Amino acid sequence: MLINPSPEQFSLVYDATPCRENDTVLLFHRNEVLLSASGDSFVLPKWRDVRPLYPDVLVTHAFTFADRRVMIGQVEPVVVSGSLSFQNTRIFRVLTPETEGYLLNVAYHLSVWYATHQFCGVCGGATYPAPTERALICSQCGYVRYPVISPAVIVAVTDGDR
């Protein structure tokens, strides 16, 4: 089950500050994410670890969790060496601690939103990231697109054996 383990520490407030060396950076290619191996598991990599492979990648602030900024970007895979490798995003289910899996899953959903809204739904023009908020702006008609929140609740109602 995906539940925010610490809602008081999670912030979706957009931060336009450029990426810093210690920021967590999740680079996605389709349904894969670049992770760093750590023993028998994987950890979310820092900018200093992935920048040598992708020095020109455009990364965007996704969210902040407990003073830890998480950035996201879309890349084409390259031959990686060392501890870095692309893994299926479903790996979020086995990452430890559980908060790492939660962070990866939220970042993946935002990454998919950016990747699937590269063009305007009104006129078809190319979009670009808004400089001060989490939005995409059409370069032709100026339409502003925000991520859609689709909450869901699953409930089971029981009455004994019925």
Named regions from a protein language model:
Residues 114-117, 124, 135:
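Residues immediately within or flanking Cys/His clusters that coordinate Zn2+
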Residues 132, 136-162:
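N-terminal strand-loop-strand
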Residues 125-128, 146:
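Short functional micro-motifs and their immediate structural scaffolds
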Residues 1-97:
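N-terminal alpha-helical interaction blocks
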Residues 106:
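Phosphate-interacting basic helix/loop segments used at nucleotide- and nucleic-acid interfaces
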